[in-house]
From Swiss-Prot:
It comes from Archaeoglobus fulgidus (strain ATCC 49558 / DSM 4304 / JCM 9628 / NBRC 100126 / VC-16). This is Translation initiation factor 5A. Belongs to the eIF-5A family. InterPro entries: IF5A-like (IPR001884), IF5A-like_N (IPR048670), NA-bd_OB-fold (IPR012340), Rib_uL2_dom2 (IPR014722), Trans_elong_IF5A_hypusine_site (IPR019769), Transl_elong_IF5A_arc (IPR022847), Transl_elong_IF5A_C (IPR020189), Translation_prot_SH3-like_sf (IPR008991). Functions by promoting the formation of the first peptide bond.
């Protein structure tokens, strides 16, 4: 899910959709309005799920999509290689996610993890 807001309402550390990918905002710089135009904002962001840097330039009055990013808890059912089978602790839905490199040694059956969900994508963020 996503909602529309004006560019002037965005803040560093917030989220924005760039190229249909939810991104975390790293920096926002606003240029002053010129003789024949409105102020423009340059937004530098990094993809939540693919860690790719992206940037856009928009007028501050333009509307832009902001993803709704949810943090949820899940229990590890099993770990096979670098794929973990998880069960959401609220909906009891089971699904598989790739295990981040830094968490591979900590993944054990029965432990809990925090994962991000936005625009139909999921990612393990950290251990609970």
């Amino acid at each position: 899910m996503k909602q529309q807001v004006e560019v002037r309402q965005l803040r560093e550390g917030g989220y924005v959709v760039i190229d249909d990918e939810p991104c975390e905002i790293l920096s926002i710089s606003v240029s002053k309005p010129g003789k024949h135009g409105a102020a423009k904002a340059r937004i530098d962001a990094i993809g939540i799920f693919d860690s790719q840097k992206r940037s856009i330039v928009q007028p501050v009055t333009a509307k832009i999509y902001v993803p709704i990013v949810e943090r949820k808890r899940a229990q590890i059912i099993s770990v096979t290689g670098n794929v973990a089978q998880l069960m959401d602790l609220e909906t009891y839905e089971t699904f598989e996610l790739e295990v981040p490199e830094e968490l591979k040694d900590k993944m054990e059956q029965g432990r809990e993890v925090i994962y991000l969900e936005s625009l139909g994508k999921r990612k393990i963020e950290r251990m609970a």
